[in-house]
UniProtKB/Swiss-Prot annotation:
Species: Streptococcus pneumoniae serotype 4 (strain ATCC BAA-334 / TIGR4)
Keyword Ligase among UniProt keywords: yes
Protein name from the UniProt record: Formate--tetrahydrofolate ligase
Amino-acid positions noted as binding ATP in the UniProt annotation, renumbered to this chain: 65-72
Broad class of enzyme this protein falls into: ligase
Length: 556
Protein backbone atom coordinates (compact mmCIF):
# COMPACT_ATOMS: atom_id res chain seq x y z
CA UNK A 1 0.00 0.00 0.00
CA UNK A 2 1.29 3.44 -0.88
CA UNK A 3 1.88 6.03 1.84
CA UNK A 4 -0.47 9.00 2.15
CA UNK A 5 1.99 11.32 0.46
CA UNK A 6 2.65 8.84 -2.37
CA UNK A 7 -1.10 8.59 -2.99
CA UNK A 8 -1.47 12.38 -2.86
CA UNK A 9 1.41 12.91 -5.30
CA UNK A 10 -0.05 10.36 -7.74
CA UNK A 11 -3.30 12.32 -8.16
CA UNK A 12 -3.71 14.73 -11.07
CA UNK A 13 -5.28 17.79 -9.48
CA UNK A 14 -7.94 19.86 -11.22
CA UNK A 15 -7.58 23.65 -11.22
CA UNK A 16 -9.52 24.93 -8.21
CA UNK A 17 -11.52 27.19 -10.58
CA UNK A 18 -12.94 24.05 -12.24
CA UNK A 19 -13.57 22.26 -8.92
CA UNK A 20 -15.81 25.00 -7.51
CA UNK A 21 -17.64 25.81 -10.75
CA UNK A 22 -20.40 23.31 -9.85
CA UNK A 23 -21.09 25.38 -6.71
CA UNK A 24 -21.76 28.50 -8.75
CA UNK A 25 -18.37 30.02 -7.91
CA UNK A 26 -16.59 31.77 -10.79
CA UNK A 27 -12.99 32.86 -11.40
CA UNK A 28 -13.87 36.41 -10.30
CA UNK A 29 -15.07 35.12 -6.91
CA UNK A 30 -11.67 33.65 -6.07
CA UNK A 31 -8.36 35.00 -4.83
CA UNK A 32 -5.95 32.41 -6.20
CA UNK A 33 -2.86 31.02 -4.44
CA UNK A 34 -1.45 29.16 -7.44
CA UNK A 35 -3.64 26.78 -9.49
CA UNK A 36 -5.00 24.56 -6.72
CA UNK A 37 -5.69 26.81 -3.72
CA UNK A 38 -7.85 29.88 -3.37
CA UNK A 39 -9.63 32.13 -0.92
CA UNK A 40 -13.29 33.00 -1.43
CA UNK A 41 -14.03 36.71 -1.72
CA UNK A 42 -16.25 38.51 0.78
CA UNK A 43 -18.44 39.67 -2.11
CA UNK A 44 -19.29 36.05 -2.95
CA UNK A 45 -19.75 35.13 0.72
CA UNK A 46 -22.30 37.93 1.08
CA UNK A 47 -23.96 37.07 -2.25
CA UNK A 48 -24.78 33.49 -1.20
CA UNK A 49 -26.19 34.43 2.22
CA UNK A 50 -29.71 34.48 0.76
CA UNK A 51 -29.35 30.91 -0.57
CA UNK A 52 -31.21 28.09 1.22
CA UNK A 53 -29.37 26.42 4.12
CA UNK A 54 -28.34 22.81 3.48
CA UNK A 55 -28.02 19.84 5.83
CA UNK A 56 -25.16 19.80 8.34
CA UNK A 57 -23.34 16.59 9.34
CA UNK A 58 -20.92 16.73 12.28
CA UNK A 59 -18.21 14.07 12.54
CA UNK A 60 -16.80 13.31 15.99
CA UNK A 61 -15.26 10.26 17.68
CA UNK A 62 -14.89 8.14 20.77
CA UNK A 63 -11.99 8.86 23.14
CA UNK A 64 -8.98 8.29 20.88
CA UNK A 65 -5.68 6.45 20.96
CA UNK A 66 -2.59 8.71 20.68
CA UNK A 67 -2.53 8.07 16.91
CA UNK A 68 -6.10 9.31 16.43
CA UNK A 69 -9.04 7.41 14.99
CA UNK A 70 -9.25 8.86 11.49
CA UNK A 71 -11.92 11.48 12.07
CA UNK A 72 -10.62 13.79 9.32
CA UNK A 73 -10.23 10.82 6.98
CA UNK A 74 -13.84 9.76 7.64
CA UNK A 75 -15.08 13.34 7.21
CA UNK A 76 -13.43 13.58 3.79
CA UNK A 77 -14.42 10.06 2.74
CA UNK A 78 -18.05 10.57 3.79
CA UNK A 79 -18.28 13.77 1.75
CA UNK A 80 -16.79 12.01 -1.29
CA UNK A 81 -19.31 9.18 -0.83
CA UNK A 82 -22.23 11.61 -0.54
CA UNK A 83 -21.18 13.19 -3.82
CA UNK A 84 -20.87 9.72 -5.33
CA UNK A 85 -24.52 8.94 -4.49
CA UNK A 86 -25.64 12.20 -6.07
CA UNK A 87 -25.74 14.59 -3.10
CA UNK A 88 -24.19 18.02 -3.69
CA UNK A 89 -21.70 18.08 -0.81
CA UNK A 90 -18.95 20.29 0.60
CA UNK A 91 -16.41 19.78 3.37
CA UNK A 92 -15.55 22.31 6.09
CA UNK A 93 -12.56 21.26 8.21
CA UNK A 94 -9.65 22.71 10.17
CA UNK A 95 -6.19 23.59 8.93
CA UNK A 96 -3.40 21.48 10.47
CA UNK A 97 -0.96 23.02 12.93
CA UNK A 98 2.69 22.65 11.96
CA UNK A 99 3.62 21.72 15.54
CA UNK A 100 1.85 18.33 15.60
CA UNK A 101 2.71 17.74 11.92
CA UNK A 102 6.42 17.95 12.82
CA UNK A 103 5.77 16.19 16.12
CA UNK A 104 3.58 13.11 16.37
CA UNK A 105 1.04 13.31 13.53
CA UNK A 106 3.24 13.81 10.47
CA UNK A 107 0.27 15.31 8.64
CA UNK A 108 -3.40 16.07 9.17
CA UNK A 109 -5.12 16.30 5.79
CA UNK A 110 -6.89 12.94 5.94
CA UNK A 111 -5.30 9.68 4.85
CA UNK A 112 -5.15 7.01 2.16
CA UNK A 113 -7.72 7.69 -0.55
CA UNK A 114 -9.63 10.18 1.61
CA UNK A 115 -7.41 13.27 1.58
CA UNK A 116 -7.66 16.98 0.85
CA UNK A 117 -5.10 18.17 -1.67
CA UNK A 118 -2.47 19.52 -2.18
CA UNK A 119 -1.69 17.85 1.14
CA UNK A 120 1.93 19.07 1.27
CA UNK A 121 0.82 22.69 1.07
CA UNK A 122 -2.06 22.23 3.51
CA UNK A 123 0.25 20.60 6.08
CA UNK A 124 2.99 23.21 5.70
CA UNK A 125 2.36 26.93 5.11
CA UNK A 126 -0.84 26.70 3.03
CA UNK A 127 -2.14 30.25 2.38
CA UNK A 128 -0.28 31.83 5.30
CA UNK A 129 -3.21 32.02 7.74
CA UNK A 130 -1.24 30.47 10.62
CA UNK A 131 1.55 32.99 10.10
CA UNK A 132 -0.92 35.88 10.01
CA UNK A 133 -2.46 34.71 13.31
CA UNK A 134 1.02 34.26 14.83
CA UNK A 135 2.03 37.74 13.67
CA UNK A 136 -1.15 39.39 14.96
CA UNK A 137 -0.73 37.67 18.32
CA UNK A 138 2.92 38.67 18.66
CA UNK A 139 2.25 42.20 17.40
CA UNK A 140 -0.12 42.57 20.35
CA UNK A 141 2.62 41.31 22.70
CA UNK A 142 5.06 43.85 21.24
CA UNK A 143 2.49 46.64 21.61
CA UNK A 144 1.86 45.69 25.25
CA UNK A 145 5.58 45.73 26.06
CA UNK A 146 6.02 49.01 24.20
CA UNK A 147 3.18 50.52 26.25
CA UNK A 148 4.99 49.49 29.45
CA UNK A 149 8.28 50.90 28.14
CA UNK A 150 6.75 54.22 27.05
CA UNK A 151 5.36 55.12 30.46
CA UNK A 152 2.47 52.69 31.03
CA UNK A 153 -0.33 55.25 30.74
CA UNK A 154 -2.98 52.58 31.40
CA UNK A 155 -1.33 51.45 34.64
CA UNK A 156 -0.96 47.83 33.51
CA UNK A 157 0.36 45.55 36.26
CA UNK A 158 3.18 43.68 34.52
CA UNK A 159 2.77 40.82 37.01
CA UNK A 160 -0.81 40.26 35.85
CA UNK A 161 -0.46 40.25 32.06
CA UNK A 162 -2.43 37.32 30.65
CA UNK A 163 -1.37 37.64 27.01
CA UNK A 164 1.41 35.32 25.80
CA UNK A 165 3.45 35.13 22.64
CA UNK A 166 2.90 32.21 20.23
CA UNK A 167 4.72 30.10 17.65
CA UNK A 168 3.26 27.36 15.43
CA UNK A 169 5.62 24.69 16.74
CA UNK A 170 5.83 22.26 19.65
CA UNK A 171 8.58 23.79 21.83
CA UNK A 172 8.46 23.05 25.57
CA UNK A 173 11.46 25.28 26.31
CA UNK A 174 9.38 28.37 25.50
CA UNK A 175 6.59 27.73 28.02
CA UNK A 176 8.13 30.09 30.54
CA UNK A 177 10.52 32.87 29.50
CA UNK A 178 11.70 36.26 30.75
CA UNK A 179 11.58 39.23 28.37
CA UNK A 180 12.97 42.77 28.57
CA UNK A 181 16.43 41.83 29.86
CA UNK A 182 19.58 43.76 28.98
CA UNK A 183 19.01 47.17 30.54
CA UNK A 184 16.62 50.14 30.22
CA UNK A 185 16.81 50.36 26.42
CA UNK A 186 15.36 46.86 26.05
CA UNK A 187 12.05 47.33 27.80
CA UNK A 188 10.61 46.37 31.17
CA UNK A 189 11.74 42.94 32.41
CA UNK A 190 8.84 40.58 33.11
CA UNK A 191 7.85 36.94 33.02
CA UNK A 192 6.24 35.80 29.78
CA UNK A 193 5.70 32.57 27.88
CA UNK A 194 4.77 31.07 24.53
CA UNK A 195 1.68 29.08 23.57
CA UNK A 196 1.26 27.18 20.31
CA UNK A 197 -0.47 29.37 17.70
CA UNK A 198 -3.63 27.26 17.63
CA UNK A 199 -4.11 27.97 21.36
CA UNK A 200 -4.13 31.73 20.74
CA UNK A 201 -7.38 33.54 21.41
CA UNK A 202 -6.89 35.20 18.03
CA UNK A 203 -7.26 31.76 16.40
CA UNK A 204 -10.55 31.23 18.25
CA UNK A 205 -11.69 34.74 17.28
CA UNK A 206 -10.87 34.16 13.60
CA UNK A 207 -12.94 30.97 13.72
CA UNK A 208 -15.97 32.65 15.31
CA UNK A 209 -15.96 36.05 13.55
CA UNK A 210 -18.53 36.59 10.79
CA UNK A 211 -16.90 39.54 9.00
CA UNK A 212 -14.22 42.23 9.40
CA UNK A 213 -16.36 44.40 11.69
CA UNK A 214 -17.14 41.44 13.96
CA UNK A 215 -13.43 40.55 13.90
CA UNK A 216 -12.52 44.06 15.09
CA UNK A 217 -15.20 43.99 17.79
CA UNK A 218 -13.93 40.66 19.10
CA UNK A 219 -10.28 41.73 18.97
CA UNK A 220 -11.13 44.89 20.95
CA UNK A 221 -12.74 42.71 23.64
CA UNK A 222 -9.60 40.65 24.34
CA UNK A 223 -8.52 41.03 27.98
CA UNK A 224 -4.72 41.26 27.96
CA UNK A 225 -4.28 41.64 31.73
CA UNK A 226 -5.12 43.79 34.74
CA UNK A 227 -4.19 47.19 36.15
CA UNK A 228 -2.70 47.73 39.58
CA UNK A 229 -6.26 48.35 40.83
CA UNK A 230 -7.26 44.88 39.47
CA UNK A 231 -9.53 46.27 36.72
CA UNK A 232 -9.21 44.58 33.30
CA UNK A 233 -7.27 46.01 30.36
CA UNK A 234 -8.50 45.23 26.85
CA UNK A 235 -7.12 45.55 23.33
CA UNK A 236 -9.69 48.30 22.91
CA UNK A 237 -8.01 50.22 25.74
CA UNK A 238 -4.74 49.97 23.81
CA UNK A 239 -6.60 51.10 20.66
CA UNK A 240 -4.87 48.54 18.43
CA UNK A 241 -7.76 46.33 17.26
CA UNK A 242 -7.64 48.00 13.83
CA UNK A 243 -3.96 47.17 13.38
CA UNK A 244 -4.52 43.54 14.39
CA UNK A 245 -7.51 43.23 12.03
CA UNK A 246 -5.34 44.65 9.24
CA UNK A 247 -2.85 41.79 9.72
CA UNK A 248 -5.76 39.31 9.57
CA UNK A 249 -7.73 40.85 6.68
CA UNK A 250 -6.91 38.01 4.28
CA UNK A 251 -6.64 35.23 6.85
CA UNK A 252 -10.34 35.62 7.73
CA UNK A 253 -11.35 34.58 4.18
CA UNK A 254 -12.00 30.81 3.87
CA UNK A 255 -9.56 28.64 1.89
CA UNK A 256 -10.81 26.37 -0.91
CA UNK A 257 -9.11 23.12 -1.96
CA UNK A 258 -10.26 19.70 -3.26
CA UNK A 259 -10.32 16.04 -2.26
CA UNK A 260 -8.83 13.20 -4.29
CA UNK A 261 -12.30 12.78 -5.85
CA UNK A 262 -12.78 16.48 -6.58
CA UNK A 263 -15.10 17.33 -3.70
CA UNK A 264 -14.76 21.06 -2.86
CA UNK A 265 -13.41 21.64 0.64
CA UNK A 266 -13.06 24.64 2.91
CA UNK A 267 -9.94 24.23 5.10
CA UNK A 268 -9.94 27.20 7.43
CA UNK A 269 -8.91 27.83 11.03
CA UNK A 270 -7.58 25.25 13.44
CA UNK A 271 -8.05 25.69 17.20
CA UNK A 272 -7.20 22.62 19.31
CA UNK A 273 -10.18 20.91 20.97
CA UNK A 274 -8.45 20.07 24.26
CA UNK A 275 -7.37 23.67 24.97
CA UNK A 276 -9.75 25.67 22.73
CA UNK A 277 -13.09 25.05 20.99
CA UNK A 278 -11.73 22.72 18.31
CA UNK A 279 -13.81 23.69 15.26
CA UNK A 280 -13.10 25.23 11.86
CA UNK A 281 -14.36 28.73 11.10
CA UNK A 282 -18.00 29.78 11.36
CA UNK A 283 -17.51 31.69 8.10
CA UNK A 284 -16.42 28.57 6.19
CA UNK A 285 -19.14 26.33 7.64
CA UNK A 286 -21.89 28.91 7.08
CA UNK A 287 -20.79 29.57 3.50
CA UNK A 288 -20.64 25.83 2.75
CA UNK A 289 -24.21 25.47 4.07
CA UNK A 290 -25.34 28.12 1.58
CA UNK A 291 -23.43 26.54 -1.33
CA UNK A 292 -24.16 22.81 -0.94
CA UNK A 293 -27.06 20.52 -0.05
CA UNK A 294 -24.89 18.70 2.51
CA UNK A 295 -21.95 20.04 4.51
CA UNK A 296 -19.69 17.62 6.37
CA UNK A 297 -17.60 19.11 9.17
CA UNK A 298 -15.65 17.78 12.16
CA UNK A 299 -14.80 18.72 15.72
CA UNK A 300 -11.53 17.78 17.41
CA UNK A 301 -10.82 14.72 19.56
CA UNK A 302 -13.70 12.82 21.18
CA UNK A 303 -17.33 13.89 21.45
CA UNK A 304 -16.76 14.88 25.10
CA UNK A 305 -14.51 17.72 23.88
CA UNK A 306 -14.95 18.84 20.27
CA UNK A 307 -18.59 17.87 19.76
CA UNK A 308 -19.74 19.37 23.08
CA UNK A 309 -17.99 22.64 22.18
CA UNK A 310 -19.34 22.56 18.63
CA UNK A 311 -22.88 22.19 19.97
CA UNK A 312 -22.61 24.61 22.91
CA UNK A 313 -20.23 27.27 21.51
CA UNK A 314 -20.16 27.12 17.69
CA UNK A 315 -23.71 26.06 16.78
CA UNK A 316 -25.38 29.19 18.27
CA UNK A 317 -23.30 31.17 15.73
CA UNK A 318 -24.46 29.10 12.72
CA UNK A 319 -27.64 29.41 10.62
CA UNK A 320 -28.59 25.83 11.54
CA UNK A 321 -27.67 23.01 13.92
CA UNK A 322 -26.34 19.58 12.92
CA UNK A 323 -28.90 17.26 11.34
CA UNK A 324 -26.84 14.20 12.30
CA UNK A 325 -23.67 13.39 14.22
CA UNK A 326 -21.37 10.63 12.97
CA UNK A 327 -19.31 9.08 15.78
CA UNK A 328 -16.12 7.49 14.48
CA UNK A 329 -15.07 4.34 16.31
CA UNK A 330 -12.13 2.04 15.68
CA UNK A 331 -11.75 -1.42 17.10
CA UNK A 332 -8.26 -0.53 18.34
CA UNK A 333 -9.64 2.43 20.35
CA UNK A 334 -12.47 0.30 21.73
CA UNK A 335 -9.94 -2.32 22.80
CA UNK A 336 -7.74 0.33 24.42
CA UNK A 337 -10.78 1.68 26.28
CA UNK A 338 -11.51 -1.94 27.20
CA UNK A 339 -8.17 -2.31 28.97
CA UNK A 340 -5.82 -3.63 26.28
CA UNK A 341 -2.21 -2.38 26.26
CA UNK A 342 -1.13 -0.21 23.31
CA UNK A 343 1.26 -2.87 21.98
CA UNK A 344 -1.53 -5.48 21.81
CA UNK A 345 -4.22 -3.48 20.01
CA UNK A 346 -3.78 -5.34 16.70
CA UNK A 347 -4.54 -8.73 18.30
CA UNK A 348 -8.12 -10.07 18.20
CA UNK A 349 -9.90 -9.49 21.51
CA UNK A 350 -13.71 -9.58 21.30
CA UNK A 351 -14.15 -9.26 25.06
CA UNK A 352 -12.11 -6.06 25.10
CA UNK A 353 -14.31 -4.68 22.30
CA UNK A 354 -17.35 -5.45 24.46
CA UNK A 355 -15.74 -3.81 27.49
CA UNK A 356 -14.66 -0.73 25.52
CA UNK A 357 -18.14 -0.32 24.04
CA UNK A 358 -19.13 1.47 27.25
CA UNK A 359 -17.10 4.44 25.99
CA UNK A 360 -18.90 4.54 22.62
CA UNK A 361 -22.29 4.02 24.26
CA UNK A 362 -21.76 7.06 26.49
CA UNK A 363 -20.85 9.25 23.51
CA UNK A 364 -24.03 8.12 21.71
CA UNK A 365 -26.10 8.93 24.80
CA UNK A 366 -24.46 12.35 25.06
CA UNK A 367 -25.17 13.28 21.43
CA UNK A 368 -28.80 12.28 21.94
CA UNK A 369 -28.99 14.69 24.89
CA UNK A 370 -28.54 17.49 22.35
CA UNK A 371 -31.56 16.19 20.42
CA UNK A 372 -29.53 15.06 17.39
CA UNK A 373 -29.55 11.55 15.86
CA UNK A 374 -26.25 9.65 15.97
CA UNK A 375 -24.71 7.24 13.47
CA UNK A 376 -21.66 5.09 14.31
CA UNK A 377 -18.95 4.74 11.65
CA UNK A 378 -16.47 1.91 12.13
CA UNK A 379 -13.23 3.15 10.57
CA UNK A 380 -11.82 -0.08 9.21
CA UNK A 381 -8.21 -1.18 9.82
CA UNK A 382 -6.43 -4.21 8.35
CA UNK A 383 -6.08 -5.73 11.84
CA UNK A 384 -9.86 -5.77 12.42
CA UNK A 385 -11.41 -9.25 12.53
CA UNK A 386 -14.89 -10.40 11.49
CA UNK A 387 -15.66 -11.50 15.05
CA UNK A 388 -14.78 -8.06 16.46
CA UNK A 389 -16.82 -6.24 13.81
CA UNK A 390 -19.81 -8.54 14.39
CA UNK A 391 -19.62 -7.94 18.15
CA UNK A 392 -19.57 -4.17 17.70
CA UNK A 393 -22.51 -4.23 15.28
CA UNK A 394 -24.48 -6.35 17.74
CA UNK A 395 -23.71 -3.94 20.59
CA UNK A 396 -24.76 -0.93 18.48
CA UNK A 397 -28.04 -2.67 17.63
CA UNK A 398 -28.66 -3.15 21.37
CA UNK A 399 -28.82 0.64 21.85
CA UNK A 400 -30.65 1.23 18.57
CA UNK A 401 -27.92 3.28 16.89
CA UNK A 402 -27.24 2.82 13.15
CA UNK A 403 -23.75 1.53 12.41
CA UNK A 404 -21.79 1.12 9.18
CA UNK A 405 -18.33 -0.10 8.29
CA UNK A 406 -16.30 2.49 6.36
CA UNK A 407 -13.16 1.70 4.37
CA UNK A 408 -12.55 5.14 2.87
CA UNK A 409 -8.83 5.07 3.71
CA UNK A 410 -8.31 2.03 1.46
CA UNK A 411 -11.25 2.32 -0.96
CA UNK A 412 -11.98 6.05 -1.16
CA UNK A 413 -15.51 7.20 -1.96
CA UNK A 414 -16.76 3.66 -2.67
CA UNK A 415 -15.75 2.62 0.85
CA UNK A 416 -18.09 5.22 2.35
CA UNK A 417 -21.23 4.66 0.26
CA UNK A 418 -23.04 2.50 2.84
CA UNK A 419 -22.29 5.07 5.55
CA UNK A 420 -23.43 7.94 3.30
CA UNK A 421 -26.73 6.19 2.52
CA UNK A 422 -27.34 5.48 6.21
CA UNK A 423 -26.62 9.09 7.18
CA UNK A 424 -28.99 10.43 4.50
CA UNK A 425 -31.70 7.98 5.63
CA UNK A 426 -31.17 8.90 9.29
CA UNK A 427 -31.53 12.62 8.54
CA UNK A 428 -34.71 11.99 6.51
CA UNK A 429 -36.36 9.74 9.10
CA UNK A 430 -35.17 11.33 12.36
CA UNK A 431 -35.39 15.13 12.27
CA UNK A 432 -33.05 16.76 14.79
CA UNK A 433 -34.48 18.75 17.69
CA UNK A 434 -31.34 20.59 18.81
CA UNK A 435 -31.04 21.94 22.33
CA UNK A 436 -27.99 23.24 24.17
CA UNK A 437 -26.74 21.45 27.25
CA UNK A 438 -26.97 24.53 29.47
CA UNK A 439 -28.35 28.05 29.59
CA UNK A 440 -25.74 30.81 29.61
CA UNK A 441 -27.64 32.48 32.47
CA UNK A 442 -26.50 29.72 34.84
CA UNK A 443 -23.56 30.56 37.09
CA UNK A 444 -20.01 29.65 36.03
CA UNK A 445 -19.97 26.82 38.57
CA UNK A 446 -23.35 25.48 37.43
CA UNK A 447 -22.33 25.44 33.76
CA UNK A 448 -19.12 23.55 34.54
CA UNK A 449 -21.01 21.13 36.81
CA UNK A 450 -23.53 20.51 34.02
CA UNK A 451 -20.76 19.53 31.59
CA UNK A 452 -18.95 17.39 34.17
CA UNK A 453 -22.00 15.52 35.48
CA UNK A 454 -24.01 15.14 32.27
CA UNK A 455 -21.31 14.72 29.58
CA UNK A 456 -18.32 13.34 31.50
CA UNK A 457 -20.49 11.59 34.20
CA UNK A 458 -18.34 12.79 37.07
CA UNK A 459 -19.88 13.15 40.51
CA UNK A 460 -18.34 16.40 41.70
CA UNK A 461 -16.35 19.47 40.62
CA UNK A 462 -13.66 20.87 42.90
CA UNK A 463 -12.49 24.45 42.40
CA UNK A 464 -8.96 25.25 43.56
CA UNK A 465 -8.46 28.49 45.49
CA UNK A 466 -7.07 30.28 42.42
CA UNK A 467 -10.14 29.25 40.40
CA UNK A 468 -12.48 30.44 43.16
CA UNK A 469 -10.78 33.84 43.18
CA UNK A 470 -11.05 34.02 39.39
CA UNK A 471 -14.77 33.15 39.48
CA UNK A 472 -15.36 36.05 41.87
CA UNK A 473 -13.44 38.31 39.49
CA UNK A 474 -15.44 37.01 36.50
CA UNK A 475 -18.73 37.72 38.29
CA UNK A 476 -17.54 41.17 39.40
CA UNK A 477 -16.69 42.08 35.79
CA UNK A 478 -20.01 40.76 34.44
CA UNK A 479 -18.46 37.97 32.37
CA UNK A 480 -20.30 35.09 34.05
CA UNK A 481 -22.95 34.72 31.31
CA UNK A 482 -20.43 33.43 28.76
CA UNK A 483 -20.33 29.74 27.75
CA UNK A 484 -17.62 27.44 29.11
CA UNK A 485 -14.77 25.96 27.08
CA UNK A 486 -13.28 23.03 29.00
CA UNK A 487 -9.54 22.36 28.71
CA UNK A 488 -9.15 18.66 29.47
CA UNK A 489 -7.29 15.54 28.40
CA UNK A 490 -8.68 13.99 25.22
CA UNK A 491 -8.02 10.42 26.34
CA UNK A 492 -10.60 10.13 29.12
CA UNK A 493 -14.00 11.42 30.19
CA UNK A 494 -12.24 12.46 33.41
CA UNK A 495 -9.24 14.76 33.94
CA UNK A 496 -7.02 11.69 34.39
CA UNK A 497 -5.68 10.53 30.98
CA UNK A 498 -5.24 6.99 32.35
CA UNK A 499 -8.90 6.55 33.38
CA UNK A 500 -10.06 4.98 30.11
CA UNK A 501 -13.39 3.44 29.15
CA UNK A 502 -16.43 4.92 30.88
CA UNK A 503 -15.37 5.95 34.40
CA UNK A 504 -18.04 7.08 36.87
CA UNK A 505 -18.24 8.81 40.25
CA UNK A 506 -14.95 10.63 39.75
CA UNK A 507 -14.19 14.21 40.74
CA UNK A 508 -12.78 16.84 38.39
CA UNK A 509 -10.62 19.70 39.64
CA UNK A 510 -10.72 23.13 38.02
CA UNK A 511 -7.35 24.76 38.62
CA UNK A 512 -7.78 27.98 36.65
CA UNK A 513 -10.37 30.00 34.70
CA UNK A 514 -9.25 32.24 31.84
CA UNK A 515 -11.66 34.81 30.33
CA UNK A 516 -11.53 34.87 26.53
CA UNK A 517 -13.88 37.78 25.91
CA UNK A 518 -12.92 38.17 22.27
CA UNK A 519 -13.76 34.55 21.54
CA UNK A 520 -16.77 34.86 23.81
CA UNK A 521 -16.14 32.05 26.29
CA UNK A 522 -14.36 31.23 29.54
CA UNK A 523 -11.71 28.50 29.48
CA UNK A 524 -11.78 26.15 32.47
CA UNK A 525 -8.40 24.42 32.88
CA UNK A 526 -8.21 20.92 34.37
CA UNK A 527 -5.37 18.50 35.00
CA UNK A 528 -2.05 19.02 33.25
CA UNK A 529 -3.36 20.31 29.91
CA UNK A 530 -0.59 22.29 28.22
CA UNK A 531 -1.11 25.26 25.90
CA UNK A 532 2.38 24.64 24.46
CA UNK A 533 3.01 20.97 23.60
CA UNK A 534 6.42 19.33 23.50
CA UNK A 535 7.94 17.05 20.88
CA UNK A 536 8.03 13.24 21.33
CA UNK A 537 11.28 11.31 21.67
CA UNK A 538 11.27 10.57 17.94
CA UNK A 539 9.49 13.45 16.15
CA UNK A 540 7.90 12.89 12.74
CA UNK A 541 10.30 15.61 11.52
CA UNK A 542 13.12 13.05 11.54
CA UNK A 543 11.52 11.31 8.55
CA UNK A 544 10.89 14.47 6.50
CA UNK A 545 12.94 15.78 3.60
CA UNK A 546 12.67 17.60 0.29
CA UNK A 547 14.31 16.50 -2.97
CA UNK A 548 16.21 18.78 -5.33
CA UNK A 549 13.13 19.19 -7.56
CA UNK A 550 11.00 20.27 -4.57
CA UNK A 551 9.25 16.92 -4.04
CA UNK A 552 8.27 16.57 -0.38
CA UNK A 553 9.11 13.36 1.51
CA UNK A 554 7.95 12.02 4.86
CA UNK A 555 4.54 13.62 5.39
CA UNK A 556 1.92 11.00 6.22
Amino acid sequence: MKTDIEIAQSIELKPIVDVVEKLGISYDDLELYGKYKAKLSFDKIRAVESNPVGKLILVTAINPTPAGEGKSTLTIGLADALNKIGKKTMIAIREPSLGPVMGIKGGAAGGGYAQVLPMEDINLHFTGDMHAITTANNALSALIDNHLHQGNELGIDQRRILWKRVVDLNDRTLRHVTVGLGGPLNGIPREDGFDITVASEIMAILCLATDIEDLKRRLANIVIGYRYDRTPVSVGDLQVEGALALILKDAIKPNLVQTIYGTPAFVHGGPFANIAHGCNSVLATTTALHLADYTVTEAGFGADLGAEKFLDIKTPNLPTSPDAVVIVATLRALKMNGGVAKDALTEENVEAVRAGFANLKRHVENIRKFGIPAVVAINEFVSDTEAEIAALKELCASIDVPVELASVWADGAEGGVALAETVVKTIAENPANYKRLYDNDLSVQEKIEKIVTEIYRGSKVNFEKKAQTQIAQIVQNGWDKLPICMAKTQYSFSDNPNALGAPENFEITIRELVPKLGAGFIVALTGDVMTMPGLPKRPAALNMDVESDGTVLGLF
